Amino acid sequence: MKYLMYLFIVLLASCSNADKSIKVKGSDTEVNLAVSLAENFYKLHQDFSVAVSGGGSGLGIASLLNGQTDIANSSRPLNTEEVSLLKAKGISIRTVVFAEDATAFIVHKDFPLDAIDLVTLTKVLNGQYKTWKPVTGQDIPINIYGRQNNSGTHSFISKKLKIQFSRDAKEMNGNAQIVEGIKHDRSGIGYVGAGYILNNGTEQPIKVLKIMEKPGSSGISPLDVKAIAAHRYYFQRPLYQFIPLTSWNKVSSFIDFEKGPAGQKIITGSGYYLIPK
């Protein structure tokens, strides 16, 4: 009888811990922010545990479909196939838009280019331009540092520019790898979250390009807070969290923390932008 009572208590404790164990998976754009939010949430709620991992928006959504995450972070909306799969599996979700991000295009700090227009950027990324000669006059190869197909940022840029990336584009695992590549490649171009640049210091040997929507127009930087607030930067986007309804009660206090003063301060302090109310 004592053994049965002990077993019941252990199981009850295990259930209690499971109810306060939150898994967050997905977007590499959001992963540093999610870690910071989780760490600060834990300081106030030490009865909770929050495990955060990246891997890309596609991985987060796949984990959602497989029942392996409570929150799927994504830098893009769900696509038609994913919506159909959720419906087929009987998974109902709630969508939270908790911050906004801008995608920054970067080159080596010594590269002789400060701004680029969308037409030229398209020709660089889709492989139409093989060298920088039409852009800077330098007859050196263009080396593209990008992401895998399951990356929300990869999908976002493809849709915004209506392109297929060059087959020669390097597929990197995340922001850190792209920045590292550009630091050592004087003819490289890559794209990363502006929040990552701001959060990891702008003193690195890289340069953030201004984006011109039309040739000759004023270039806008993704680091320009006022421009982002006015929605003047072409590559800015909302950041999503997809949450199965079965996990909502468990994660609601974490979501409330994100939306509260402390969470909002972390969002802006990490180089991301608040959603206008």
Report residues per predicted region.
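Exported/periplasmic ABC-transporter solute-binding proteins
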Residues: 15-72, 76-80, 84, 93-101, ...
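Glycine/small-residue-rich loop that forms an oxyanion/phosphate-binding "nest" at active or ligand-binding sites
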Residues: 89
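Intrinsically disordered, low-complexity segments enriched in small/polar residues
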Residues: 1-4, 143
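Sec-dependent N-terminal signal peptides
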Residues: 3-12
